[in-house]
């Protein structure tokens, strides 16, 4: 019997932000990308107050300078990002940890609380060269789950950060089957989910259903959409992710899928503070394109939250 006087869990406090990705930034240094100072100026001008670090080395890596550059623009950092290949087992652990520790230290010094961990690509995201089998063996899945837990535990103990795993196109954690498998084989107290709505839709997943089923594992959101027509061409041609992005597979909301208002509505009742970071993959893109898109997207998301 339902008791009407039972207290309801508080609604999640959704903190909207953006990231270098939405300015066409994929690499620490690339002639096709805008400079880091322009990114910081424009993300603040677009009305965001939260950002991610993006690829290590794009923003200043000196903690004092990074804090100064972000603070004087009214910006705060929510997370850093690492790519990992933990399915390869113990042989890659030390090398992986050396990279993770470097990023985690800067992330902590920037005042952020999250480390976004993206699994390694099975094919090169620029050239399409196949690097590994598309499917992991049972042994590789065991290594992935076990070492992801070890990574999350060590990151928490040494840097005080929460690790959120980011399913990503052209990695071994992409489809609903693979995402659920990782969640079901890892400790929920250690390993949380960074749900990227665009990547999940790209790989055939339903973000709302995932939130409704695994909401207690949701630690972080990346908001983006895919263009269904472009995605159909990408799938028909089996294009790698990089060329797909160059063709515009990730599009400006609300022009694609999934609809973001139901995603936010599904996340709000979870009763946790949650970052919702806009990440519209646009590499490469004209330098004057990101700012107007960022303004419109922020206004759209704010309208969903105010509604």
Per-region residue spans from a language model:
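Acidic/histidine-rich catalytic cores of soluble enzymes
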Residues: 18, 50-51, 145-257, 306
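Active-site acidic/histidine proton-transfer and metal-coordination neighborhood
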Residues: 2-8, 92-193, 289
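Non-cysteine beta-strand/loop elements that form the S-adenosyl-L-methionine
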Residues: 17-19, 78-80, 115-120, 216-227, ...
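A short, acidic, amphipathic alpha-helical segment used as a generic capping/interface helix at domain edges
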Residues: 254-270
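Acidic-and-aromatic substrate-binding clefts and catalytic sites of carbohydrate-active enzymes
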Residues: 27-32, 50-65, 85-96, 169-175, ...
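Short, flexible, mixed-charge acidic loops at enzyme active sites
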Residues: 30-34, 121-129, 230-243
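N-terminal pre-domain/capping segments
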Residues: 2-112, 138, 142, 149-150, ...
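C-terminal/domain-terminus segments
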Residues: 274-304
